[in-house]
Curated annotation (Swiss-Prot):
UniProt-listed CDD domains: Anticodon_Ia_Leu_BEm (cd07958)
Chain sites annotated for binding ATP: K748
Catalytic activity: tRNA(Leu) + L-leucine + ATP = L-leucyl-tRNA(Leu) + AMP + diphosphate
Natural source organism: Mycobacterium marinum (strain ATCC BAA-535 / M)
Motif ('HIGH' region): 86-97
Chain ranges for the short sequence motif 'KMSKS' region as given in the UniProt record: 745-749
NCBIfam families with a match to the protein in the record: leuS_bact
EC number: 6.1.1.4
Record GO terms (molecular function): aminoacyl-tRNA deacylase activity; ATP binding; leucine-tRNA ligase activity
Statement: the UniProt record of this protein carries the keyword Zinc: no
Descriptive protein name: Leucine--tRNA ligase
Length: 976
């Protein structure tokens, strides 16, 4: 229990000096001790100070600086609750932001009152573009702006009375935090994925296996004969972090590359809405694809919304099929294998041409010197030579997004002037490039089967290519047939079903050395570099030959240097040929260093990219468990206690992780996927005991509001709009103008943002908390209506009046020793049982409804004074929702300790059983009356009561029913 506060908040604060806006004008004459916005402000301010002074929400760790000072063990019953932490924007919070924070606070407070050791803290995801863009505009260092925003966020969140352990708060921009982000990067960099063991292992173990001869090189070279540089190349190719010349999403308007997940479906940047181009650049990549199977399979053990699981499954995109090797001839005469992946190997005999992604590595090698005799002009794209046609086609599609390329109704492409041999038929087929084939999926090459794939059919029709039927059942002259059937025109496969043919052709490809069964994924490796300033620097330097070297852990943190200009070189948003130029390159003294990496002092250059904004959020849950540890990112004992598997509690396949994580579904394939990947690597390397970061996830809905636009589509301030005669007008500078209402997000740009400060000023933070929780289920979006806040305010006033005399400030509670009457006991214990069940399930809206119902019951039942035994449980039940008011009433009721640690009241099952049952009485199927009988009444007693009811008798008018049907506990039906 927490010690008693030394001050009595609100009890001597005096009468309110004015009326908060939004509250009934009658409150200007309110009694001195009424619960008003001013009184609430005093109560809330003082209790927040008390909680901070007493460390009410400080939670102990098993070991380290936050362990109990007396050496006592931590409670076994723990709960780790986490919110997706906010980005501290300059605009501050609007009323939609606290929805999830309040919900988790109610959940945490309830379980804390039930005696659990609850970890609940909140940090800030503070790296990112907005602070950097502000710095570019003003010349202010991003840290200055970010820290000011964090101060404002903490002030706003503090007003809400959230029960966070403030000792555990941090920002991802804190050097003490991003030191460990860099450390984790090094763990991943210095690891490789052992496919046989299906896990990551230290790279040193791979080197040892090569040195000992236990592992051979896949290309057949002798490890012992390789030079130091060649060995380094081999090792670098195995690392989980590697550099690759790969196709990336280049955004000239932002001056940086973007991950696939940061590009919208129409090929523009998610932030700024600039065009994004596909460009080949050398970039840092993380080998997340090595974990594709585990990321998919472990979704089954997570208590997550089906929507999020489906989004991750679709993003990872596992496909089962086969690879097939077509042989082609390079322009220099060498034979080369062209590997394709297909989920339909059964259609191999129907492959009449090949299509490569325009970015495929082999395209330039396969371009013919000239057009073959008799080439169809439709195939050439108007080019004088294949090389000219390919170059022109690549230029034409450079600005298209992947989605545009895949969904385009018009199929285009050009012939390379060369052919490949179909391994099933032995016949040559022409090779094309086309934009509907993507380099990032499969092998970047497809075998085109126009008879049974509609995109291939469309392409074949457009370019006059042959269409062959290999599965009977459709009319391929009209469209591709994608249904089931038996194989035809397929040699030894003829007559087989699709399933049989898949197995048979795969076996033949394997035996002939022309292919094999294979699983492919849509998931691509994670592009892990940004050409920005405000992000975590890489702990990487380059030697004079351009070879990367990881810094030793002792060199961490690598701190961001000051630079004269924070902006990358920005380009015309449509300039696809531009090249990135990171801001850190301007800090020349920081970039160029002399270091001793074990072979003497030598010159090196630092990496001038920074990590993406997702880096800090990929592991921050772990830092909450041990935020002050200077020696490790977190002590294993603390991680095991807060996040380790608990099979006795959660089942034998419990993956461990945070007990409850709440945040938006928009992060399903970004933050949540990246965090799972990092956590699994840390698990494989033995740094954590949990194999997943988040055991249970809930996606909160959104608070939405009306916005208003004028005839030009420009938004006007929503609070100034007047509703009149079924329409809306805005009093502009030149008089009233008609405006148009729309419903959706809340935001500064829509001019409909409402600050929680306004509601706290006008009603108090507890009212805001109760209102937001009463609006609907946590997962549902809901409309904001300031006019409805008064309902929550008046509910809290009624609770206050049950305890406090508004005129005198005296306690109204009856300290009678007599036992409560049966009706009150039944109402009390039903409320306790229902509210407890709702809190545990995060059904806060129905908990509010039950508390209102019980409050109304007490108000009507006990008009003079409510018995203490009836009111104290109400105060305890209200505490998770309205903690300031509850603490104040609890103290005024004579208690000397805070109720933050309980006890939460327990329901007596004896009062949860109904003594009576109400039966609707139907006559020929229509309800004509209702009767109340004892819960254990037999059918005869129920029939007698129904027939004796005055309303039923009046309707029967002396007639006798032919039949009386009793459905036990539900209804009586009289058939006349």
């Amino acid at each position: 229990m927490t010690e008693s506060p030394t001050t009595t908040p609100g009890s001597t604060s005096g009468a309110p000096s004015g009326v908060p806006s939004g509250v009934n004008d009658a409150e200007s004459d309110a009694p001195r001790h009424r619960y008003t916005a001013e009184l609430a402000a005093g109560v809330e301010r003082t209790w927040q100070q008390n909680w901070a002074r007493l460390g009410t929400f400080n939670v102990p760790n098993p070991v380290g600086s936050l362990a109990p000072s007396d050496g006592s063990p931590v409670p076994e019953d723990k709960l780790f609750v986490q919110d997706m932490f906010p980005y501290p924007s300059g605009e501050g919070l609007h009323v939609g932001h606290p929805l999830g924070y309040i919900a988790t606070d109610v959940f945490a407070r309830y379980h804390r009152m039930k005696g659990r050791n609850v970890l609940h803290a909140l940090g800030f995801d503070a790296f990112g573009l907005p602070a950097e863009q502000y710095a570019v505009q003003t010349g202010t260092h991003p840290r200055t702006r970010t820290e000011a925003n964090v101060v404002n966020f903490r002030r706003q969140l503090g007003r809400l009375g959230l029960g966070h352990d403030s000792r555990r708060s941090f920002s991802t921009t804190d050097v003490e935090f991003y030191k460990w982000t860099q450390w984790i990067f090094l763990q991943i960099y210095n690891a490789w994925f052992d496919a046989a063991a299906n896990k990551a292992r230290p790279i040193s173990e791979l080197v040892a296996e090569f040195d000992s001869g236990a592992r051979s090189l896949v290309d057949g070279r002798d490890w012992s004969t390789l030079s130091a540089g060649e060995r380094a190349d081999v090792i670098d190719d195995h690392r989980l972090v590697y550099r690759a010349d790969s196709m990336v999403n280049w955004c000239p308007g932002l001056g940086t590359v973007l991950a696939n997940e940061e590009v919208t479906s129409d090929g523009r940047s998610d932030r700024g809405n600039f065009p994004v181009f596909r460009k080949r650049l050398r970039q840092w990549m993380m080998r997340i694809t090595a974990y594709s199977d585990r990321l998919l399979d472990d979704l089954d053990v997570l208590d997550w919304p089906d929507q999020v699981k489906t989004m991750q499954r679709n993003w990872i995109g596992r496909s089962t099929g086969a690879s097939a090797l077509f042989t082609a001839t390079r322009s220099n005469g060498e034979t080369v294998g062209l590997e394709v992946f297909t989920t339909r190997p059964d259609t191999l005999f129907g492959a009449t041409y090949l299509v490569l992604a325009p970015e495929h590595d082999l395209v330039d090698d396969l371009v013919g010197a000239g057009w073959p005799a008799g080439v169809d002009p439709l195939w050439t794209g108007g080019g004088a030579t294949p090389a000219e046609a390919v170059a022109a086609y690549r230029r034409a599609i450079a600005a298209k997004s992947d989605l545009e390329r895949q969904e385009s109704k018009e199929k285009t492409g050009v012939f390379l002037g060369s052919h490949a041999i179909n391994p099933a038929t032995g016949q040559p087929v022409p090779i094309f490039i086309a934009d509907y084939v993507l380099a990032g999926y499969g092998t970047g090459a497809i075998m085109a089967v126009p008879g049974h794939d509609q995109r291939d059919w469309d392409f074949a029709r457009a370019l006059g290519l042959p269409v062959v039927e290999v599965i009977a059942g459709g009319d391929i002259s009209q469209a591709a047939y994608t249904g089931d059937g038996v194989l035809v025109n397929s040699g030894f496969l003829d007559g087989m079903s699709v399933g049989e043919a898949k197995q048979a052709i795969t076996a033949r490809l394997e035996s002939d050395g022309h292919g094999q069964a294979r699983i492919e994924f849509k998931l691509r490796d994670w592009l892990f570099a940004r050409q920005r300033y405000w992000g975590e620097p890489f702990p990487i330097v380059y030697d004079a030959d351009g070879r990367p070297h990881a810094l030793d852990e002792s060199a961490l943190p690598v701190e961001l240097p000051d630079v004269p200009d924070y902006s990358p070189v920005l380009f015309d948003p449509d300039d696809a040929n531009s090249e990135p130029s990171p801001p850190l390159g301007k800090a020349t003294e920081w970039v160029h260093v002399e270091l001793d990496l074990g072979d003497g002092l030598k010159p090196y250059s630092r990496d001038t990219n920074v990590m993406p904004q997702w880096a800090g959020s990929s592991w921050y849950e772990l830092r909450y468990t041990d935020p002050h540890n200077a020696d490790r990112f977190c002590a294993k004992e603390n991680e095991t206690y807060w996040m380790g598997p608990r099979p006795a509690e959660h089942g034998p396949d419990d993956p461990g992780g945070v007990d409850l994580y709440v945040g938006g579904a928009e992060h399903a394939v970004l933050h949540l996927l990246y965090a799972r990947f990092w956590h699994k690597v840390l698990y494989d390397l033995g740094h954590v005991s949990s194999r997943e970061p988040y055991r249970k996830l809930i996606n909160q809905g959104y608070i939405q509001a009306f916005a208003y636009t004028d005839a030009r589509g420009s938004y006007v301030p929503a609070e100034e709009v007047i509703e009149r005669d079924g329409g809306f007008v805005y009093p502009g500078a030149d008089g009233e103008i008609e405006v148009f209402q729309e419903f959706g997000k809340i935001g500064k740009s829509l001019k409909n943002s409402i600050s929680p400060d306004e509601i706290c000023d006008d009603y108090g933070a507890d009212t805001l908390r109760v209102y937001e929780m009463s609006m609907g289920p946590i997962e549902a979006s809901r409309p904001w209506a300031t006019k409805d806040v008064i309902g929550a305010y008046r509910f809290l006033q009624r609770v206050w009046r049950l305890v406090i005399d508004e005129n005198t400030g005296e306690i109204l509670v009856a300290d009678t020793p007599a036992e409560l009457d049966t009706d009150t006991l039944r109402a009390l214990h039903r409320a306790i049982a229902g509210v407890a069940e709702d809190y545990a399930a995060l059904r806060n809206n129905t908990a509010v409804a039950k508390l209102i119902e019980y409050t109304n019951f007490l108000t009507k039942r006990h008009r003079d004074a409510v018995p203490r035994a009836a009111i104290e449980p109400l105060v305890l039940m209200v505490a998770p929702l309205a903690p300031h008011l509850a603490e104040e009433l609890w103290q005024r009721l004579g208690h000397t300790t805070s109720l933050a640690h309980g006890p939460f009241p327990a329901a007596d099952p004896a009062y949860l059983i109904d003594d009576t049952v109400e039966y609707p009485v139907q006559v020929n199927g229509k309800v004509r009356g209702r009767v109340v009988v004892a819960a254990d009444a037999d059918d005869d007693a129920v029939k007698a009561a129904a027939l004796a009811d005055e309303k039923v008798q009046a309707f029967l008018a002396g007639a006798s029913p032919r039949k009386v049907i009793v459905v036990a506990g539900r209804l009586v039906n009289l058939v006349v």
